[in-house]
């Protein structure tokens, strides 16, 4: 994975004052690291990821951090389930940065049922949705559909065109 390319392209899509949702994927965690080093002065970060919250705890107070709680999934190091979805339903998101287990010609997919449910809710509530996937995700298919490929405002990848 050329994650530097992914995180740089992702960071360029962020603007001052954005309300971001960052999912619990390792790909999006690279973007979170880049955002933590950036010069933004006003961002709100919403996440269900324990790793992302730990990263952003060191940021200045002008960053608003919102952690979605719920049932803890140790495999994904994140919170998922009905409580997480209910908390998300109360929030506005301007831009969501998401990843997937696989991306084929039709769909982005995952192997985690509750993660799929949360991502679908995030996409429905966000003004813009970005999928970050490294080249290893192409042609793979998971059990649960996140969304149609065309539902994303942009697919950010390190794959050569």
Where do the language-model regions lie?
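Conserved phosphate- and dinucleotide-binding cores of soluble alpha/beta proteins
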Residues: 50-161
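N-terminal active-site beta-alpha-beta segment that forms phosphate/nucleotide-binding
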Residues: 1-80, 85-87, 91
């Amino acid at each position: 994975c050329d994650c530097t390319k992914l995180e740089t392209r992702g960071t360029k899509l962020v603007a001052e004052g954005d309300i971001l949702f960052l999912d619990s994927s390792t790909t999006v965690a690279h973007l979170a690291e880049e955002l933590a080093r950036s010069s933004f002065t006003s961002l709100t970060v919403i996440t269900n990821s324990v790793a992302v919250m730990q990263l952003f705890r060191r940021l200045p107070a002008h960053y608003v951090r919102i952690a979605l709680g719920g049932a803890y999934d140790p495999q994904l190091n994140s919170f998922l389930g009905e409580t997480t979805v209910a908390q998300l339903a109360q929030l506005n998101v301007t831009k969501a940065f998401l990843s997937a287990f696989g991306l084929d010609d039709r769909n982005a997919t995952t192997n985690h049922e509750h993660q799929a449910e949360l991502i679908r809710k995030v996409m429905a509530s966000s003004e813009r949705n970005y999928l970050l996937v490294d080249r290893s995700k192409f042609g793979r298919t998971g059990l649960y559909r996140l969304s149609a490929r065309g539902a994303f405002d942009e697919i950010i990848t390190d794959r050569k065109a």
